[in-house]
Amino acid sequence: MPGPSLSLALVLSAMGALLRPGTPREEVFSTSALPREQATGSGALIFQQAWDWPLSSLWLPGSPLDPLCLVTLHGSGNGSRAPLRVVGVLSSYEQAFLEAVRRTHWGLSDLTTFAVCPAGNGQPVLPHLQRLQAWLGEPGGRWLVVLHLEEVTWEPTPLLRFQEPPPGGASPPELALLVVYPGPGLEVTVTGAGLPGTQSLCLTADSDFLALVVDHPEGAWRRPGLALTLRRRGNGALLSTAQLQALLFGADSRCFTRKTPALLLLLPARSSAPMPAHGRLDLVPFPQPRASPEPEEAPPSADPFLETLTRLVRALAGPPARASPPRLALDPGALAGFPQGQVNLSDPAALERLLDGEEPLLLLLPPTAATTGVPATPQGPKSPLWAAGLARRVAAELQAVAAELRALPGLPPAAPPLLARLLALCPGNPDSPGGPLRALLLLKALQGLRAEWRGRERSGSARAQRSAGAAAADGPCALRELSVDLRAERSVLIPETYQANNCQGACGWPQSDRNPRYGNHVVLLLKMQARGATLARPPCCVPTAYTGKLLISLSEERISAHHVPNMVATECGCR
């Protein structure tokens, strides 16, 4: 190999990255799209489980996998059997609102329920409520999107920002209503950038709901949010922050919480609608995880040897992972002061060191450059005889590594044919400049693949052979303290952390007297292990008794306390 061969250094360095195991990318599901508690109601709407939609990239509206609920109305006042298509979390507050709209006859008492002022005061919300009532009776394929409040700002002007709708949910709706569950309030007027003019509200002690017409709903989920200006009817005085909070967030005395507003969007019918439920609730299933995209095939190489080698590496190590760019903490000043010189991989010492080890990368610095800073003169092969001996050594080691690789258990079926083809293509034409490089490259690649496959075997056997020897340094099997952080479990309010304990230590014969309740089975296993017998699953130190723990959790609408069993380990033993 004449002259400095930096190309080989680059190839071998790349092989180190190429031989690292990689796995295809996996799509990650959002964990929030889970079924919630069944909502109970006393009216005529059948509301069962409420659902969140998953990540917007995981489903398309109108497809067979829409995460929607089909809700069927029943009762004497409704003859329709068509289901309601609802997307989003339908809490008991929205259920009560829709029940009230469905039952109302728009008399004076009904108008009071919705804080609608008497006729003649210009109420744009009344026609919209009547259209919503018509949809509840005859949905006609239209579907309702429920968006809940995400953020509120009080100063200087109240700003309400809601959830962003799912894909397709932001299309122009037939109607958009801001539904508020008010507390005690006064007669007020409401204006805002997303509202069609001034809307009047006449709140009384009998008002349960407050609805506002929104003509530009897209501003409700975009920053800064939906701006509202509330003034007293008559004198036009602005409401204070305390009055606004009491009006817009009514108290829920049953659950000791506040009722948050919701934005309802009624969207037009789509061509692909699910079949009617015929009196039953159907849930269109959530989308299954998408299969990971197939790895991009490398472009065909002009060299069949390199193309076959790439296929073998991917067959054994898996497709290359899309790793983030490496970040090296290098000091430019230190690098500038480092001795500069040529790296010569044709140097006899370099080649011998490369063959003596199995690492695909070798970093060399000539001794003269390290001491004096003067670059060393590149040295060529010692003699043709030495070069021939080195070639024979490469060929012998190549055949030995290939034989070991073929004998490894669990090898993919595609690997042996690819390996045979590589050996047939190597060393190729000995007179060509790439002949020696090809043999050396294949040797280092096969050594790396062999090391990786052996590492997989060792990790697998280590998982299966969790024996007493590995835990001997920790003493005999005994109960150890372990604190568990529950703050990641968002539904658990109290406690934030608790002492769960864990079991750790060696399982050997004779057993420790810390847990006298032995089983005959584990005694026999421990005696076999003491006699030197190999067990596929040696006895492990595990909890044998538990106690419960009182947890205070937050469900959709209430705070509850539960005594959860098997939360704290109290005894340990070998099993």
Swiss-Prot record:
The record marks R466, S467 as: Cleavage. It comes from the Eukaryota. InterPro entries: AMH_N, Cystine-knot_cytokine, Muellerian-inhibiting_factor, TGF-b_C, TGFb_CS. Glycans are attached at N78, N344. Preproprotein is proteolytically processed to generate N- and C-terminal cleavage products that homodimerize and associate to form a biologically active non-covalent complex. Binding of the non-covalent complex to AMHR2 induces dissociation of the pro-region from the mature C-terminal dimer. The N-terminal portion of the protein, despite having no intrinsic activity, has the role of amplifying the activity of the C-terminus. One of its GO terms (cellular component) is extracellular space. Pfam families: AMH_N (PF04709), TGF_beta (PF00019). Expressed in fetal testis and adult ovaries. GO terms for molecular function: growth factor activity; type II transforming growth factor beta receptor binding. Disulfide bonds join C477-C541, C503-C572, C507-C574. Keywords: Differentiation, Disulfide bond, Glycoprotein, Gonadal differentiation, Growth factor, Secreted, Signal. Residues 1-24 form the signal peptide. Residues 25-466 form a propeptide. Transmembrane segments: none annotated. It is found in: Secreted. PROSITE patterns: TGF_BETA_1, TGF_BETA_2. Gene3D superfamilies: Cystine-knot cytokines. GO terms for biological process: anti-Mullerian hormone receptor signaling pathway; gonadal mesoderm development; Leydig cell differentiation; Mullerian duct regression; negative regulation of ovarian follicle development; ovarian follicle development. Belongs to the TGF-beta family. Homodimer; disulfide-linked. Plays an important role in several reproductive functions. Induces Muellerian duct regression during male fetal sexual differentiation and plays a role in Leydig cell differentiation and function. In female acts as a negative regulator of the primordial to primary follicle transition and decreases FSH sensitivity of growing follicles. AMH signals by binding to a specific type-II receptor, AMHR2, that heterodimerizes with type-I receptors (ACVR1 and BMPR1A), and recruiting SMAD proteins that are translocated to the nucleus to regulate target gene expression. This is Muellerian-inhibiting factor. The lineage of its organism: Eukaryota, Metazoa, Chordata, Craniata, Vertebrata.
